[in-house]
Amino acid sequence: ADEGLADRTRVVGDVMVDVLLDVARRPDDDPLLAGRLPTSPYVLATIHRAENTDDPTRLASVIDALASIDAPVVLPRHPRLRDRCAAAGISLEGGNLNPIEPLSYAEMVWAVQGSVAVATDSGGLQKEAFVLGRPVTTLRTETEWVETLAGGWNVLLPGLEDIGATVLRPAPTSPRGTPYGAGDAAERSLAALAAF
């Protein structure tokens, strides 16, 4: 407000939501994705942040917790995760883990759409899962996207307690709303610029 821009500021939404929804509307017929995801209900998990991977004890706890979830857990091998597990002698093959090679952006969107839930420490994936209507469990103490916490769509679980029940909780019935826009941020931006 001190800059004197309040009268000229327009909230139009997040153009990344525009991209997400555009990709989500495309057919998920990528032959590279075929056969890489379970046909039964699965959880999509991603782990790569330093707070979950740099300490071998914490990393082992996270991997063990994910492996204990009572559903297949698809876990793309992020390079940091792969390297830290290899250095610590931690296997990604145990329990219900289904480790796969990293996914492209479109493949990740389709994997979220096919999942029943998401468990992650990724900032972007929290928001994407929320926008796509999947319950997300964030394995961190905080989120950049506080709007995702409303109604229980995103639950912070840094301590990993009751991870199975938390990750596999029923999808909330509360409306998510569109705090990041409805997929029309680009058009709204152009309209706002044209109106100046």
Please state what every model-predicted region is:
Residues 1-53, 57:
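A nucleotide-sugar donor-handling region in carbohydrate enzymes
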Residues 95-104:
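Active-site donor-binding acidic/aromatic loop of nucleotide-activated sugar
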Residues 137, 152-156:
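A short acidic/histidine/glycine-rich donor-binding loop in glycosyltransferase catalytic cores
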Residues 63-77:
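A conserved nucleotide-sugar
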Residues 108-148:
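A donor-sugar binding/catalytic signature common to diverse glycosyltransferases
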Residues 78-96:
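Short, structured helix-loop element that forms part of the nucleotide-activated donor/catalytic region
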